[in-house]
Amino acid sequence: MKEFYLDSCGGGRLHCAIWTPESEPKAVVQLIHGIAEHIGRYDDFARFLNAHGYVVAADDHMGHGGSVENGVKGYFSGGWLSAVEDEKRLHDEIAAQYPALPYYILGHSMGSFLLRTYLYTYPDAVDKAVISGTGWEDPTKVRLGKLVCRLEQARVGETSTSKLVTKLMYGSYNKSFGAVTSPNAWIC
């Protein structure tokens, strides 16, 4: 794995990595990780893909892994569309290095939503896409959730973590694991 940085569209430095196979590569796979994750969690998967001839590239979204700035976790400086543009920036960087190879993107969980926005914005940018661990919510619940988030953002600040929003979003995820020591045990 080779690590490097790109300038984020929303400001800051975007931590990236590329895994290259020992054999002749047959395609590029870009990974878009989920919420409360980082690219290091995908190292084994990237090496598995390498063993099958794939170049793998990924970035830590702003506020995640090696792209956390000033201790502010989970915050996309520039917002959602900036995170989508960061994925495009990584795509362009890697596609320029491997112009003859097919280009695939896999988005998992929150990464699947970023990928869905990406595909809507750039429908011809990739050859194949894998949308993993995605979801759908009732539009009324989504509107209510957005309202709660806006109110909490006004109360605690744009870059602060709201305990209420965290509990509403993830509170039930750990229930099936029994006694856990990590609020993110559900990610396993």
How should each PLM-predicted stretch be described?
Residues 34-37:
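Active-site glycine-rich loops that stabilize anionic/oxyanionic intermediates
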Residues 1-23:
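N-terminal cap/lid segment of alpha/beta-hydrolase-fold proteins
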Residues 77-95:
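Alpha/beta-hydrolase active-site loop
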Residues 116-188:
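Alpha/beta-hydrolase-fold enzymes
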Residues 107-117:
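Glycine-rich nucleophile elbow surrounding the catalytic serine of serine-hydrolase chemistry
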Residues 41, 46-71:
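Conserved alpha/beta-hydrolase
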Residues 98-109:
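Alpha/beta-hydrolase fold nucleophile elbow
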